[in-house]
């Protein structure tokens, strides 16, 4: 398997080939032609992301079928059994083969919206649901990225600059309070 530096080089090479063939970057590791519905959704700020990748509209419900699949009802996640024997046993017994799940809290939903805004629009508005303390914690986690000039932060908004777009995962991870807890 390639090392991290080789992976980055392969990604940049692939990105260049996409650009040379008329594709545009629409999100993390995703490309589309300008005529594609994904690009149009990005331009209209209606791009959405779910477990399967980017979509041209919000996914209200996603039902995962099969072993290890993940379902998302927007307010909760559920993952099916990952082990084939456990999965088959539950299915044969007529039991829904859920391995684990999580109900999202009101705070989770606010954080989720900010993360999706960053993933899909490379910006999010601070004044939506975040308290001063949480904003301060997020800014502390983003300090190195701020110092490198990869994002702009104003009183009401955080915007990922073009040169920061390749670090959007690192940026939105600062919003995920569960990674810190």
Sequence positions of predicted segments:
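C-terminal scaffold of the Radical SAM
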Residues: 1-128, 132
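Short, amphipathic alpha-helical interaction segments positioned at domain boundaries
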Residues: 163-181
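A short, conserved structural fragment
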Residues: 146-156
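An alpha-helix initiation/capping motif
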Residues: 8, 136, 162-165
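Short amphipathic alpha-helical interaction segments
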Residues: 131-147
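Minor-groove-contacting beta-hairpin "wing" of winged helix-turn-helix DNA-binding domains
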Residues: 157-161
